[in-house]
């Protein structure tokens, strides 16, 4: 008999975890040199998201591939960030990010554009729940640097509400400026 308020034991945890979608971005065979030779293991890079604006990435190492993926997934779930999305489908504004020699440019796109992104960035946008974005990667094509540069860019993304609060403005005034309809200059022109 399941106790009330605990989600039915282990089943409650499984239901909570099922809200996340994970994508394996990269798997790498690594070697540790020891006295008797080399010990081989695996390193996994995983991206996890809820497809509603939260996403995280994690890195896990183990002697077997499934264990490395499990560790990376747990690490990603502990490192989730929230990204504000416009209309639940794209970015509010264009943004750049960098990590090491990896640079990425993320651009907001009109509805119906789809995810135009290469390699590891596509996994980030799919797990984030973004439907329309144009992304370009420059410099390093190392998946670790591309993921970190993408997350750097996503953390720079601000919603109009956050920008308005920072500037002590109303959101409607800020939106009017974005659309080019400042009321005072429109009356003069």
Curated annotation (Swiss-Prot):
InterPro entries: Ribosomal_Su5_D2-typ_SF, Ribosomal_uS5, Ribosomal_uS5_bac-type, Ribosomal_uS5_C, Ribosomal_uS5_N, Ribosomal_uS5_N_CS, Ribsml_uS5_D2-typ_fold_subgr
Keyword Membrane: no
SUPFAM superfamilies: dsRNA-binding domain-like (SSF54768), Ribosomal protein S5 domain 2-like (SSF54211)
Coiled-coil ranges (or none): none
Domain notes: The N-terminal domain interacts with the head of the 30S subunit; the C-terminal domain interacts with the body and contacts protein S4. The interaction surface between S4 and S5 is involved in control of translational fidelity.
Subunit structure: Part of the 30S ribosomal subunit. Contacts proteins S4 and S8.
Protein name, entry field: Small ribosomal subunit protein uS5
